[in-house]
Amino acid sequence: MSVTSEVQGLRALNEVDPEIAELIRLEERREADTLRLIASENYVSRAVLEATGSVLTNKYSEGYPHKRYYEGQQQVDVVEELARTRVAKLFGADHVNVQPYSGSPANLAVYLAFAQANDTIMGLGLPAGGHLTHGWSVSITGKYFKSVPYGVRESDHRIDLDQVRDLARAHRPKLIWCGTTAYPRTLDFAAFRAIADEVGAILAADIAHIAGLVAAGVHPSPVGIADVVTSTTHKTFRGPRGAMILCKKEHAGAIDKAVFPGLQGGPHNHTTAAIAVAAKEASEEGFRAYARQIVVNAQALGRALESRGFRLITGGTDNHLLLIDMTPKGIAGKPYAQALDRAGIVANYNSIPFDPRKPFDPSGLRIGTPAVTSRGMGVAEMERLAAWMDEVAQNVNDEARIARIAAEVAELCRGFPAPGIRL
C-alpha cells in the first residue's frame, strides 16, 4: 500500500474502517426491516442522501452568500441561495436562514436575537409536550432566562390558552414560544399572536415536528403570524439533520447576526445542499399527497388502537403523532417500548400530561406515522400495526410470540421498501 493512497484517502470505507462499515450496513438492515414509529424520525430520499454525502462537506464558508471570509465560494453561494429561496417560496416567508446546525441552535439564535439574559420567556412545559429549549429548567434556556411554563388542561389535555393569557399578563414575557414535541392537536397560532400582541412579546413558533405538514398545507402555517419561525429540516420535512429560521423582513438582520457570528462559525454546506433538495421535493404535488396521507394514517392508527383499549391523549390526533397512556393496558411506557422494539416496531416511551411516573420510566408512548408513510403504507397497514401493538402489550414477556411478530413485521417491510436504502 502506497503512502500516497493512504494520505489521499483513496480507499473505500469498508477497506479503511470495516467496523464502521459493518455498523452502517447493520443500521441499513434495521431501518429496512422494522416499522419506525418514532415521530421525529423519517426516511430521506436517495437525492437528499447524495447531497448530504457530497464534496460540499470539504468547503468552509463563514458568512453569507457574496459576503464570505473565504474565497472559492462560487458553487456554495448558489447552493445556499437556492436553499433560502426555495424554502421562502414554499412557506411564503420574507426571509430564511438555513445555516443553523440543528433545531436547538436555531432556537438559541432566536433568544440571542430578541432577548437578554434574565428576560422572562414562556413556552409549553416539557411534561405537557413542549421542548427543552422552550425554557425547561434543565436546559440552558431555563438557566439563562426566567422561564414561565404554561400547560394543558387536565380535562382534555389541550393547550390551556386561558392560562397562557393569564400568565402572559402577569409576567409580561419578552418572548413567547408556541411549539411542541408531543402534542397531537392543531396549534392556534392566531390565538398566540393575540396574546403576544397584548403584552408586547415576540412570538416564536417552533414547527420542527410539523414543518412538512405546514409546507403541504395540511396544518395551518404560522408564517406571517409569528415574528419568527424555527424548524428542523428532518422529521416530516424529510430533509437532512439541519434547521432553518423563517422571519419577517424587519427581523432578518437580527436573526442572521445571531446565527453568524453570534452562535456559529461556518455552515455545513453539504447539509445546506440537502435542505435545498428537500425543499424542492416538498414543492411537488407528490409531497402534498404524502403529507395528507401521514395524517390519514395517524388517525386510522389511532382509531384502531382505541378500539383495542389503548387510551389516546386528547382522544386522537390532527397531525402525525399519537401520545398514548399505557395505564389501562397495565404496563408502563418503557417496558412496552422495549418489547415493541424486540418485535420490530420502534417507538419511544414518553411522559404524558400530569404523569405520576418519572420521565425515565413514564406512563406513555409516543408514536408517529411519517416513516411508515414514506414507505408507501396506508390505512390497511395501520390496522395490522395496531393488531401487532395490542398483541405485544398483552404478551410483553412471551419472547416466542414477539419473535413471530418481528418476522411478520419484516415480511411486511419487504413489500414496502425503505426510501434511500439500497441493500
From Swiss-Prot:
Gene3D superfamilies, sorted: Aspartate Aminotransferase, domain 1, Type I PLP-dependent aspartate aminotransferase-like (Major domain)
Gene Ontology biological process: glycine biosynthetic process from serine; tetrahydrofolate interconversion
SUPFAM superfamilies reported in the protein's UniProt record: PLP-dependent transferases
Reactions accelerated catalytically: (6R)-5,10-methylene-5,6,7,8-tetrahydrofolate + glycine + H2O = (6S)-5,6,7,8-tetrahydrofolate + L-serine
The EC number(s) this enzyme carries: 2.1.2.1
Record has Transferase as a keyword: yes
GO CC, any one term: cytosol
Enzyme class: transferase
Subunit structure: Homodimer.
Protein name per UniProt: Serine hydroxymethyltransferase
Organism: Sorangium cellulosum (strain So ce56) (Polyangium cellulosum (strain So ce56))
Organismal lineage: Bacteria, Pseudomonadati, Myxococcota, Polyangia, Polyangiales
Gene: glyA
